[in-house]
Amino acid sequence: MEIILFLTMMVMIAYVFSGYLYRVALVQSSRVDLIFTRFENMCFKIIGTDLEHMSAKTYVKHFLAFNGFMGLITFVLLIVQQWLFLNPNHNLNQSIDLAFNTAISFLTNSNLQHYNGESGVTYLTQMIVMTYLMFTSSASGYAVCIAMLRRLTGLTNIIGNFYQDIVRFIVRVLLPLSCLISILLMTQGVPQTLHANLMIRTLSGHIQHIAFGPIASLESIKHLGTNGGGFLAGNSATPFENPNIWSDFIEMGSMMLLPMSMLFLFGRMLSRHGKRVHRHALILFVAMFFIFIAILTLTMWSEYRGNPILANLGIYGPNMEGKEVRFGAGLSALFTVITTAFTTGSVNNMHDSLTPLGGLGPMVLMMLNVVFGGEGVGLMNLLIYVLLTVFICSLMVGKTPEYLNMPIGAREMKCIVLVFLIHPILILVFSALAFMIPGASESITNPSFHGISQVMYEMTSAAANNGSGFEGLKDDTTFWNISTGIIMLLSRYIPIILQLLIASSLVNKKSYHQDKYTIAIDKPYFGVSLIVFIVLLSGLTFIPVLLLGPIGEFLTLK
């Protein structure tokens, strides 16, 4: 019952909050201008931008240059961190390949961690590298999404200014909400300190080092920005990051808020005046929520069903391996599905210990990469499936393929298909390389089907910019650091460039057909068609390899 109440409440909050995002996205005046305008203007002066509207090509150039500069600075700081200040625990520099992976991971909003949070980075790099990139990577995804929506909806005839979009989102959305969430987490017991690790003597007489630090400030943006990188190696399964059920709900709600609000924002932009959400966006929301609930049901059923091997021994009950007793199987399954649907990657349980079908659920969500998804980018990926559905359905019934009164032509379809293919190609090709390259498969710690699942999950998590993992995999090696780094880089930037190209190409076309010659995108049957095409297209792509992994493990586990 508490899960139903929580999900209902988050949908309502996201719907209301999308109205505020509408004013932020369209640079409309609001009551908070007096608070934020001066700070924004100061940021614009520091950046040196004149706030002139950019072309799509210029927008992408500045987006890539901004991200490239941040990535370079991050890489340098990680390989020299031991010689800098705010390192009371004397943590060492990262190796070249690990720093490459870490920099790309946080730059692309993936937060895939091949290092231990306690010893792999210093307080300085946690705050000015990890936390900073959690803000900017999230805001970058939002900015390019808003640029795409401005073009698709035709609400304005400009694409916007990249620096204005990213600064306004950080100042007016991320910073205020992060401060609020940090305070709420601190009230629940999440630490926020610059003191060195505690050294205590246990009851058995041994010396124990307890790691903590500025956790609350990172924890808030980690979930709000759908980042996922943990301050500690155990991530949100540790009491210092996620002490109790209330902090658990706060963190899950933080993950869901902005991606769901972005979908409602799209609906408000379609309705022109922003007072209501267009029916088309509501259809998309219901379709995605249906898939979300279906995967959640599968995961919870599998986890509550438990391990059949233990059942044969007379030990019945839910699967509690790798789970925190304070959360149990139910909230652990909910957190797992939310963190993979919204591509956050934080965990409150160990995904490697999930049952076969329990691990299949989050893996499928990352393979789809459209069920709400991350900040902005998730909606952009969903719109690619929407365009595919419109094109195929239109041709099936003999109507003109148009979306929002814009004809979909051969040029757009080439880009759409390329965006669709990038994701599975990266996952499947690099997974195959993991078994072909000598030494790479030595990182696998489980034989047979589950070992294949470990590899598939790691590559899928990198391609979806998620960051969670089957952590039985020994992934801090040269192969895994370089391969997943390349995957995260390509899967982030190539689709974004193509998606903005698609939007700019569509907006230059005008429809010469009446509504009766095009399919209706605001009817329930379109939502059903969208679900069917998502399942069919992804199923044909990934079912063979899933049979070798979690499905095969499920069928043989007796």
Swiss-Prot record:
Ranges annotated as spanning the membrane: 1-21, 66-86, 127-147, 166-186, 245-265, 281-301, 327-347, 354-374, 377-397, 416-436, 482-502, 531-551
Topological category with respect to the lipid bilayer: Multi-pass membrane protein
Source taxon at top rank: Bacteria
GO MF annotations, alphabetized: P-type potassium transmembrane transporter activity; potassium ion binding
InterPro entries linked to this entry: KdpA
Keyword list, A-Z: Cell membrane, Ion transport, Membrane, Potassium, Potassium transport, Transmembrane, Transmembrane helix, Transport
Main location (coarse class): membrane
Pfam families: KdpA (PF03814)
Record GO cellular component, one term: plasma membrane
Location(s), subcellular: Cell membrane
Function: Part of the high-affinity ATP-driven potassium transport (or Kdp) system, which catalyzes the hydrolysis of ATP coupled with the electrogenic transport of potassium into the cytoplasm. This subunit binds the extracellular potassium ions and delivers the ions to the membrane domain of KdpB through an intramembrane tunnel.
Subunit organization: The system is composed of three essential subunits: KdpA, KdpB and KdpC.
Family membership noted in the UniProt record: Belongs to the KdpA family.
Protein name according to UniProt: Potassium-transporting ATPase potassium-binding subunit
Organism: Staphylococcus aureus (strain bovine RF122 / ET3-1)
